Amino acid sequence: MQPPNRKSCYNFRVTEIVKVLDGDTIDVIIDLGFDLYKKERVRIAGVDTPEKRTRDLEEKALGQDATDWLKEQLDGAISGEDDLVIRTELVGGMGKYGRLLGWLYIGDETESINERMIQQGYAWEYDGGTKKKDFQELREIRGIA
């Protein structure tokens, strides 16, 4: 997973986090400039989290953990001095379901929330192909094996 270079992407400033739908999808209001704002559904790029809406109780619990972790990361991200920025590719910045594909950055951080999700065991790396469902891997990274 390689986030886009700052010079080869669009950077959208988030003015409001409307809702965290699950561990890899959020609804936000972005500032387009000139007093124009747009509500966007954002698919967090390069990651896949366990599903919250499933009959599999193990996956459901891990999916809720990922959602809660993301909410915690975003809590206060736009109310303080730091901005939440969504960085998207210049070409191909939309996913197959019409969602904006983005890397999330808070303030001047150089590491994206997307990368931290993987490193801390809340998501698998995902390139749009076959989804991974190795729950044991996530538990081991988080130390809850």
Predicted segments, located by residue:
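Small beta-barrel nucleic-acid-binding modules, primarily SNase/OB-fold domains
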Residues: M1-A145
